[in-house]
């Protein structure tokens, strides 16, 4: 019984820590965010949906990838994409999370082995209020919000999909590239 109490206390402590990290409570709103830490915090928060049959495959670049951003907003991006992937797989399957550097950007790739997104639907997934979920199960705002947040951070998002392999790729400028651009003579002249 004592062991069970200790384990439960540890899990609660981990969840509280993850919630504080997820919301960036007690932190400045804009900061250099470690993308892998951000993804891991989101996965911890979503563990209740993942533990029912979703296997998470991680492939993270070893070098920290920092993005100057509103951290809680990026967590919302990961939440929306991961939640949709879990729903697409009906709660059972493989979720793949990958990070890598591409020139001056970090790329986050989130994929699943669900049924895929038909082309006629894929053309509309980023539109506000577009949903394929039943009434009461979705608002159709998740991917619209995701797109707006990514664009706010001067990034890009793309999706490729076929049965068994749907991938969302998010490109975000690395923190050092953002600093260089912000300090460039052309940007200073506009200010």
State each model region's role.
Residues 92-104:
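Short beta-strand/loop element within the Bergerat-fold HATPase_c
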Residues 112:
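Acidic ATP/Mg2+-coordinating residue in the GHKL
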Residues 142, 146:
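Short alpha-helical Gxxx[C/S/T] motif in the catalytic ATP-binding
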Residues 117-129:
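Short conserved segment of the HATPase_c
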Residues 51-65:
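Conserved catalytic submotifs in the C-terminal HATPase_c
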Residues 149-151:
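Detector for a conserved hydrophobic position within an alpha-helical segment of the HATPase_c
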Residues 27, 62-68, 72:
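A short, conserved loop immediately preceding a beta-strand within the C-terminal catalytic
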């Amino acid at each position: 019984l004592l062991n069970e109490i200790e384990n439960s206390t540890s899990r609660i402590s981990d969840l509280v820590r993850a919630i504080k990290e997820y919301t960036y409570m007690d932190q400045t709103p804009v900061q250099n965010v470690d993308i892998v830490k951000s993804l891991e915090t989101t996965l911890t928060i979503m563990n209740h949906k993942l533990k029912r049959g979703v296997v998470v495959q991680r492939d993270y670049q070893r070098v920290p990838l920092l993005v100057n951003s509103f951290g809680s907003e990026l967590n919302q991006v990961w939440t929306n994409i991961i939640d949709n992937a879990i729903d697409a797989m009906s709660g059972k399957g493989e979720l793949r999370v990958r990070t890598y550097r591409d020139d001056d950007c970090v790329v986050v790739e989130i994929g699943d082995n669900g049924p895929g997104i038909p082309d006629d639907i894929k053309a509309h997934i980023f539109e506000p209020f577009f949903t394929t979920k039943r009434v009461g199960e979705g608002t159709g705002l998740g991917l619209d919000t995701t797109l707006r947040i990514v664009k706010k951070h001067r990034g890009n998002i793309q999706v490729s999909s076929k049965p068994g392999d749907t991938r969302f790729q998010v490109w975000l400028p690395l923190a050092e590239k953002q600093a260089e651009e912000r300090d460039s003579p052309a940007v200073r002249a506009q200010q």
